[in-house]
């Protein structure tokens, strides 16, 4: 019988639902119902409930940056990371707690997606001169004209590294700060291209974070699983991460939740902060 249903409260009851309209067939009933809803909406002048928040199928950078919770994060001097799935709120990282960020994945497409996402956020928030990209894999050349320094494949990166080291040492000497963000799009290729020494990396990471220099290190999990002085140092000193893979498929960070995991899409990540992971939606 149409409109007949079971409703479970303390006990199961049989109920009969009635529509406020009639019609000769289902299509006519539906059409009449739509008209009735429209007239009720037009007549109602009182308060209405808020829309149920939903994570969109695809999140653009403009949509993300214009979310009220994203704007609030920026006003509070926080770096917005992504949108969590439960409350559909922006999750962000306070700059007062932001040292450096590791992006970890087992897929090249996911690494590229997360890197693009973070670069776009930085470009929305900061002057281009405050951003440097070391892009040894030449996957992000579309940003070359939008940042202060872009060092691509087969380009000399030593001069830029030396300049960063000098700025860090000068700022430490003068007890001053300078806000600057360095995105390394593939750590393995960058280490090969730059011949950076472990002590150089240590200086940039440890002294840099004291004067406002922030690195975003993007790497495949296989590189970080290797045993070199560079990888051992990174694993010991990087404790905030965007993990674009199942937590159970990596061994760098301990899982904070042991529930069943689904494979992540390229626009989904785990934000690992203070030993807890939160699943987030990022932009495409």
Residue ranges and their predicted role:
Residues 1-80, 225-284:
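Phosphate-binding and hydrolysis-coupling loops of NTP-dependent motor/remodeling domains
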Residues 66-239, 246, 283:
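P-loop NTPase catalytic phosphate-binding loop
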């Amino acid at each position: 019988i149409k409109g007949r249903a079971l409703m479970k409260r303390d006990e199961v009851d049989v109920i009969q639902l009635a529509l406020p309209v009639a019609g000769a067939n289902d299509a006519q009933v539906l059409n009449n119902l739509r008209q009735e809803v429209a007239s009720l909406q037009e007549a109602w002048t009182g308060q209405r409930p808020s829309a149920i928040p939903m994570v969109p199928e695809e999140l653009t950078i403009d949509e993300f940056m214009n979310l009220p919770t994203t704007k609030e994060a920026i006003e509070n001097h926080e770096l917005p990371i992504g949108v969590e799935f439960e409350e559909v709120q922006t999750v962000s990282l306070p700059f007062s707690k932001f040292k450096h960020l590791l992006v970890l994945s087992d897929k090249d497409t996911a690494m590229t997606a997360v890197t693009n996402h973070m670069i776009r956020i930085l470009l929305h928030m900061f002057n281009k001169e405050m951003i440097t990209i070391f892009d040894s894999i030449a996957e992000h050349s579309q940003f070359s004209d939008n940042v202060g320094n872009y060092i691509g494949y087969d380009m000399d990166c030593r001069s830029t590294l030396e300049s960063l080291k000098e700025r860090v040492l000068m700022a430490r000497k003068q007890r001053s700060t300078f806000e600057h963000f360095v995105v390394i799009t593939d750590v393995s290729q960058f280490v090969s291209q730059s011949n950076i020494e472990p002590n150089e990396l240590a200086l940039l990471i440890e002294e840099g974070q004291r004067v406002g220099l922030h690195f975003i290190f993007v790497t495949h999990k296989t590189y970080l699983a290797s045993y070199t002085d560079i990888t051992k140092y990174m694993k010991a000193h990087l404790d905030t991460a965007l993990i674009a893979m199942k937590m159970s498929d990596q061994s760098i960070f301990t899982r904070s939740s042991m529930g069943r995991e689904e494979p992540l899409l390229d626009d989904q990540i785990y934000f690992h902060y203070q030993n807890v992971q939160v699943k987030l939606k990022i932009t495409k």
